[in-house]
From Swiss-Prot:
Belongs to the MurCDEF family. Keywords: ATP-binding, Cell cycle, Cell division, Cell shape, Cell wall biogenesis/degradation, Cytoplasm, Ligase, Nucleotide-binding, Peptidoglycan synthesis. ATP binds at residues 134-140. It is found in: Cytoplasm. GO terms for molecular function: ATP binding; UDP-N-acetylmuramoylalanine-D-glutamate ligase activity. Pathway: Cell wall biogenesis; peptidoglycan biosynthesis. It holds the Pfam family Mur_ligase_C. The keyword Signal does not apply. The keyword Cell division applies. Its main location: cytoplasm. This is UDP-N-acetylmuramoylalanine--D-glutamate ligase.
Length: 474
């Protein structure tokens, strides 16, 4: 694939951060002729050995970023964990150095490829993009959209924040390891969107907004502005009627489709009518048919319908895709039934909004909820109402246990402390009654106690399995 129009050959590019995304950037840029080096503020970046093995020509610099080093580059490529406000980055940008991220490089490459396809003697259709962001539900909606597009007969690549970095996905296609997709379905974080300006998605959504990453953003307005960058193109805007902050992102003159847990205001919007998913006034499918429970998943399904329908795909195929969607790991995932109590892993619930949705999604069932970890500067106040309405008890772990305890103190629900997650499982087992749920939905990041949210889930599931074995022996 020819990217001469991007003028990468010989360009001095410095990649900042050597996680999965940084490594993918270094690899893709090197293949396409850039003079690549990598800098990471950590003394021992996670992929240092892999970089040396697979890209020995790429120099690695470790330790604090130096302004002069960054300013000497033609282009900075920022990993999601490196903010534009990083002083050395800000100084380089002020001196005229371009700063982009992997999604921006992908968007530019895709524009070149689509232009080349259109210029062929027998023009080929452009590859389309569905782009998804939001505080909660991103991965679920992304996976739903991928399944629904496949059910409609399209070749699909799902990538981005959901797992496979976009440039790794593009590299696999360039190497012939995967087919060229008809549609890209991308999950994008606010961190990625900060450095993205050229993405022109066929349909894009900001699913919802609640406090998250307040250790990175000065306020909710800055966080929302980063999310809104997903609408930089000309495609359909998909917005949540139940979230005023996302509705405010509607751009005059753009095609807007909304979704919400109410009746549809117009014929092209999606909503709920008498416990059925509906498009305008047309009933589409009973909510009970969805394999993923809870009203938050009803909202996810409606968003996915709005996004995929924007590609003019047949509604029957999209509904079949929804019916077959079984959910994702660590998103209110059932782990076990023990003595009449159902245990759920929602380790991916890393902010207050996600935990609120998980608790309300329990319906009439009371839950013993395990909360705590690294709160990322969030306001835990909104948890109080959800705890009061749905929790039998709260078990607290991690760095911000004290802050959460203070926020829910007046909820009328007792809270308990645990030193470890296995201890929390034991306490929850004693507190839960038959017919209850035990829900790990921490409302926090995991890095104070675990490698990541997956590691936290593994520890939880292991503890639940041990509990099940012990109860079976009694």
């Amino acid at each position: 694939m020819n990217y001469d129009a991007l003028q990468l050959s010989g360009r001095k590019v410095l990649v900042l951060g050597l996680g999965d995304t940084g490594l993918s950037c270094a690899r893709w840029l090197s293949v396409h002729g850039a003079d690549v080096s990598v800098a990471d503020s950590r003394e021992a970046p996670p992929h240092a050995a892999r970089l040396a093995e697979t890209l020995p020509q790429v120099a690695l610099f470790t330790g604090p970023f130096e302004a002069a080093h960054l300013a000497a580059a033609d282009m900075l490529v920022l990993s999601p964990g490196v903010p534009l406000s990083e002083p050395a980055v800000a100084q380089a940008v002020a001196q005229g150095v371009e700063a982009v991220g992997d999604v921006e490089l992908f968007a530019r490459a895709l524009a070149v490829l689509n232009a080349q396809r259109a210029a062929l003697p027998a023009p080929q259709a452009a590859m389309r993009v569905i782009a998804i962001t939001g505080s909660n539900g991103k991965s679920t909606v992304t996976a739903m959209c991928g399944d629904m597009c496949r059910m409609a007969g399209l070749t699909v690549c799902v990538a981005g924040n959901i797992g496979l970095p976009v440039l790794d996905a593009l590299h696999e296609i360039e190497q012939g390891a995967a087919p060229l997709p008809q549609v890209w379905v991308l999950e994008l974080s606010s961190f990625q969107l900060e450095t993205t300006s050229s993405l022109d998605a066929t349909a894009a959504a900001v699913l919802n907004l609640s406090e998250d990453h307040m250790d990175r953003y000065p306020d909710m307005a800055a966080y929302a502005a980063a999310k809104a960058r997903i609408f930089s193109g000309n495609g359909v805007q998909v917005l949540n009627r139940d979230d005023p902050r996302t509705l405010a992102m509607a751009i005059p003159g753009r095609h807007v489709v909304s979704f919400g847990l109410d009746r549809c205001p117009t014929d092209e919007n999606f909503g709920l009518c008498e416990d059925e998913l509906c498009l305008g006034g047309d009933m589409l499918m009973p909510l009970s048919v969805l394999a993923v429970p809870g009203l938050h998943n009803a909202a996810n399904a409606l968003a996915a319908l709005a996004l995929t329908r924007a590609l003019d795909l047949p509604i029957e195929a999209l509904l079949r895709g929804l019916m077959h969607f079984k959910g994702l790991p660590h998103r209110v995932e059932k782990v076990a039934d023990i003595d009449g109590v159902t245990w759920y892993d929602d380790s991916k619930g890393t902010n207050v909004g996600a935990t609120e949705a998980a608790l309300y999604g329990m319906g009439r069932r009371k839950a013993v909820v395990i909360l705590g970890g690294d709160g990322k500067g969030q306001d835990f106040g909104p948890l109080k109402a959800a705890v009061a309405a749905n929790a039998r008890a709260v078990v607290l772990i991690g760095r911000d246990a004290v802050a959460i305890e203070a926020a829910i103190e007046d909820s009328g629900v007792a809270s308990y402390r645990a030193d470890t997650l296995p201890d929390a499982v034991e306490q929850a087992a004693r507190l839960a009654e038959p017919g209850d749920a035990v829900l790990l939905s921490p409302a926090c990041a995991s890095f104070d106690m675990f490698r990541n949210y997956v590691h936290r889930a593994e520890v939880f599931v292991d503890a639940v399995k041990k509990l099940a074995a012990q109860r079976a022996q009694v």
